[in-house]
Amino acid sequence: MDAHDGEADELPPPPPVPANVVPIKADDVESEVPANKPAKPKRFPMARPGLGRKGQPIQLLANHYKVSVKSSEEYFFHYNVILKYEDDRPVDGKGVGRKVIDKLQQTYRSELSSKDFAYDGEKSLFTIGALPQVTNEFTVVLEDVSTGKTAANGSPGGNDSPGGSDRKRVRRPYQTKTFKVELCFAAKIPMNAIAQAIKGQESENSQEALRVLDIILRQHSAKQGCLLVRQSFFHNNPNNFVDLGGGVMGCRGFHSSFRGTQSGLSLNIDVSTTMIVKPGPVIDFLLANQKVDHPDRIDWQKAKRALKNLRIRTTPVNSEFKIIGLSDRNCNEQMFSLRQRNGNNGDVDEVEVTVYDYFVKNKGIELRYSGNLPCINVGKPKRPTYFPIELCSLIPLQRYTKALSTLQRSSLVEKSRQKPQERMSVLNDALRHSNYDSDPMLRASGISIAQNFTQVEGRVLQPPKLKAGNGEDIFPRNGRWNFNNKKLIQTCSVDKWAVVNFSARCDVRNLIRDLIRNASAKGIQMAEPFDVFEESPSLRRAPVSRRVDDMFEQIKSKLPGAPKFLLCLLPERKNCEVYGPWKRKCLAEFGIVTQCLAPQRVNDQYLLNLLLKINAKLGGINSLLQIEASPSIPLVSKTPTIILGMDVSHGQPGQSDRPSIAAVVSSRQWPLISKYRASVHTQSPKLEMMSSLFKPRGTEDDGLIRESLIDFYTSSGKRKPDHVIVFRDGVSESQFTQVINIELDQIIEACKFLDEKWSPKFTVIVAQKNHHTKFFQSGSPDNVPPGTVVDKQVCHPRNYDFYMCAHAGMIGTTRPTHYHVLHDEIGFSPDDLQELVHSLSYVYQRSTTAISVVAPICYAHLAAAQVGTFLKFEDMSDASSSQGGHTSVGSVPVPELPRLHEKVRSSMFFC
């Protein structure tokens, strides 16, 4: 699912950084390579050392369509596009660019040697072969361009048809609009670079050539009137819409992109979903968005934020505008100056009228309910243009870029499910309906697309055997296991604990009784709680900080000492407002392990899942890999090895100023690989590269890695790790060189800071979940079995990558995780590395199922999300200006997170 912010028609993502280029900021050039220090040799993603062989062979289909490319000595010519109005003002609207270029192509076809264009909608245009001139200047006239401009301030109907009395106040829409277009030669790209990319000989040219092909796909969809979101396109077809409530709809479309693979060039097509605003009357959207049943109950400040920058169509004149805000007063009170010609002497007088009177009396338009509501402003900040709200309707295919509610997310998942066979049918239909073979630019590029899925050879790895309590074995089946009649392998004792109840609905006594009974069955010694602390009903509407503080005052006044553990019953769902302040109080201020729950239907399975989390948080282990308990993991069990999981969590859509949160989890108590701890820092908003792995401050290092290394040393018999395995989540292919240069260098510096002579070996692996490759069993309606690994046919032609489906896809179509091995000094064989990755999907202590990505990455995501709630309730402006904040280059200060209490710093508090 596409969940990124962005304009409807924007540039494709930049191509991956070529092998001979490492991106750096211009400002950092001097500081990066000091005069007295030679530049470090740069690392590049490693080549594939071989293929895996372990596992049961399985024949699969992938949603890649093979592409044949005719050999060509031609070139793609790249031209920069400069668009201006007739008066030399730059054209800033994105939608008009394609219309202008299409008209240019029609008008000047002979002057352009009948060349076809590939235009990205912005500033880049490509042709096959050169245009007649290096610089080409044209004048283009578009008809029926409605500008929405007005002649003077305050007019309520810039595109209306005024009567004789106000004809000078409002111009009719321009019937034609003149543009100046300049096409300037920028570069040429050999088309045979595509063939080089397929052979694994990547260069800047090959990436640019593939980018041109992707731009052709986008242009092809744009000509069909689609909404474009990166490489995905969405048709205005109500059959593709699902109502999620709140005035939001899920819109199903398709992703399409060209990819170089081991078997040649392929077209990857997949189902994609984006969120759109429900089209129709503005008032209907606002009522649904705010969940109210009458316009009088609308919060107009919220409405203003929700409507800003959306586009509307007005009646009765059918003109389109962008909303910039709302009027300060209601429609029947909002005044503006109207110039009218005096019938007696022909002079022009100015009169003050309300927007309501203008439309009702001057225009003869009946307004049923707009009088007491604000107007829609479609003008400019200093030149407002107002329309009554009931004359405005939201146009289709406008992206909704704010965060979805929990209910909306659940609804989207429920309504977007597709079984594998259904998805295959939908994708094949999408390719046929796209009719790419008719595209003149693709034909001229020598591109021909097959109509069938690519056949792929996969392998199914055996699930790892697990160890439970009393030496019993667990044999997972279909990615699942259970603890029926078994105990946990290493249990904690819960003796100093209490229950905190913010909920008025829960039967606390029965919950405690059943929890203790289930704990005993799994080998956990759980005493009766010291007390149950009930929130006073009078505080339930109080500020959340007061509610949490009051609860801790109760605890301190009644308990003889600090509890080891607090069970917290939340008033509603888990992400309620109490959650963040409660976690912060427990983990940062008092060092108390806490487990929150919002029980609705409590049964023994629910309580077992709860106990798995409690046991892990308090230092226990629920199950171990048999090869971990032996220990016999190749290259891990015999040499001290630390495993790191790294992730950066960003603010949700609409929270662009919220700091990003970087988390590093690290294994402890080697030779175990099932126990972890976490370190978390804030960094600049939307910054994906980690900036806090190594942070020297005088004689100290305040970075994330130092804490992990010291904890490994103290928990592993005073051994320093000789091997460091890094799993990195959330980065794109264009950022791979930064991971193995900028981030890996920080980790190495952190090691050297502790011991100059210490030189561990590193393996760096990136895990990607947001890709569009899916696998299907030919002739079977089922998902691919858990343990399926693919490293042939559809993987990179040179680089070391593979796809892993470790989990059982119970609903919809399984999404494999795409692992990229960027760097491997340790020297794993392909089989050993794939087995390790597979095994790490079985050490997730929160559940009894294999998970879709290695546990260290899941833990890093959980840690970042949980500690991120510490900031959710702070005044960000105050936090940003406090002395505790740190400042990144060219940005505002970033608030620092409170440090975790030493009692819980090495715990699995995030579990």
Swiss-Prot record:
Pfam families: ArgoL1, ArgoL2, ArgoMid, ArgoN, PAZ, Piwi. Residues 1-51, 149-171 are annotated as: Disordered. One of its GO terms (biological process) is regulatory ncRNA-mediated gene silencing. Residues 281-396 form the PAZ domain. The keyword Nucleotide-binding does not apply. Residues 565-872 form the Piwi domain. GO terms for cellular component: cytoplasm; nucleus. InterPro entries: ArgoL1 (IPR014811), ArgoL2 (IPR032472), Argonaute_Mid_dom (IPR032473), Argonaute_N (IPR032474), PAZ_dom (IPR003100), PAZ_dom_sf (IPR036085), Piwi (IPR003165), Piwi_ago-like (IPR045246). The keyword Hydrolase does not apply. Keywords: RNA-mediated gene silencing. One of its GO terms (molecular function) is RNA binding. It comes from the Eukaryota. Probably involved in the RNA silencing pathway. May bind to short RNAs such as microRNAs (miRNAs) or short interfering RNAs (siRNAs), and represses the translation of mRNAs which are complementary to them. Belongs to the argonaute family. Ago subfamily. This is Protein argonaute 4B. The gene is AGO4B.
